[in-house]
A protein has these predicted regions:
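GST-like domain detector, emphasizing the conserved glutathione-binding G-site
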Residues: 1-124, 140, 243, 253, ...
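GST-like fold's C-terminal all-alpha helical module
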Residues: 92-206, 210
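Mixed-charge, Lys/Arg-rich low-complexity intrinsically disordered regions
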Residues: 213-245
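Short, flexible, glycine/charge-rich loop motifs used to bind or transfer phosphoryl groups or to couple energy/partner
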Residues: 43-44, 167, 239
Length: 297
């Protein structure tokens, strides 16, 4: 059983919610606070703060690409893209993702946050995100530049959607889920945004949004521990030099939200880093990170 640690207004969570809805994957929900501390999740995976996190038994995936692969039984082909599509995905999930927030006014952002979490938590959220970006290695675009980038992005989407209902063709694929969630976020921040988009794009967004409208049960703390206990998989693979299996290391994103997770190194290869962490219950869990975009010390 998949367990998703998420919160309603998280764009990357929406990416996985839509993917699981389309695939008909049964999953359970753990709704976490919009910003740390998150007592339950922190106790499992340490300092890593990005959301969502996907749990499959004793395996915890701290990246939506790794999570997508795990949901498809390790089938790497499920998210393989050609070079042109991969470049478009990278643009969507990096520059466009951040442009979404830069293109909106502060009033729009605060109004949305207030509607979701109330005034006090909205203020805490903004302060948290400002602190999160202090040691970031990325530079957000100005509002005008961000709006121009989003306009270009929507225009490119229209061209790509001219030949099918989805970017992948007749049914959604990995590229659809990656490119959808930035526009999903824009629609929440700016209610009038979609009225300015071509109908091919608005209809595609509506089709994608419908995929995540599935009811799920809440995972109890007991169910979480039971899921861990029922998984005896130990991902003991290659550890590339100069590191050795069992080294106590820290892993953190290299661009933003650079809080670290500490554990024992069990996998280090070209694609991923996996740490083992012991819980107070005596159980072991395995926390998976992508190799690209993360620092290992």
């Amino acid at each position: 059983m998949a367990i998703l640690y998420h919160y309603p207004m998280s764009p990357y969570s929406e990416k996985l919610r839509a993917a699981m809805g389309f695939s008909g994957i049964s999953w359970q929900s753990v709704v976490v606070p919009e910003q740390p501390p998150r007592a339950l999740l922190d106790g499992l995976i340490g300092g890593y703060r990005r959301i969502p996190v996907l749990q499959m038994g004793a395996q915890f995936y701290c990246d939506t690409r790794l999570a997508f692969e795990a949901l498809h039984d390790g089938d790497g082909g499920a998210f393989q893209l050609d070079s042109g599509d991969e470049a478009f995905r990278e643009w969507a999930e990096s520059e466009i993702f951040f442009a979404v927030f830069s293109a909106c006014s502060s009033l729009q952002v605060l109004r949305f946050l207030h509607s979701q979490v109330g005034l006090a938590d909205a203020i805490r959220f903004v302060r948290d995100r400002m602190g999160m970006m202090k040691n970031a290695t990325i530079t957000p675009l100005g509002r005008k530049s961000a709006a121009i980038q989003i306009h270009r992005y929507v225009a490119d989407l229209e061209l790509r959607l001219a030949s099918g209902c989805f970017l992948a063709g007749d049914s959604p694929g990995y590229l659809d889920f990656c490119c959808y969630h930035p526009l999903w976020m824009i629609c929440h921040l700016d209610k009038a945004a979609s009225s300015r988009w071509p109908h091919l794009v608005t209809e595609w967004v509506a089709r994608m949004r419908a995929l995540s409208n599935n009811e799920v049960a809440t995972a109890s703390p007991e169910a979480i521990l039971e899921s861990i206990s029922g998984d005896d998989t130990k991902p003991l693979e290659t550890v590339e030099a100069p590191f050795r299996r069992g080294d106590r290391v820290s892993v953190a994103p290299s661009d933003y939200a650079r809080d670290e997770t500490i554990g024992e190194l069990v996998v280090l290869n070209r694609e991923r880093i996996v740490l083992s962490r012991g819980l107070d219950s005596g159980q072991l869990i395995y926390v998976h990170f992508p190799r690209e975009g993360f620092d290992l010390v």
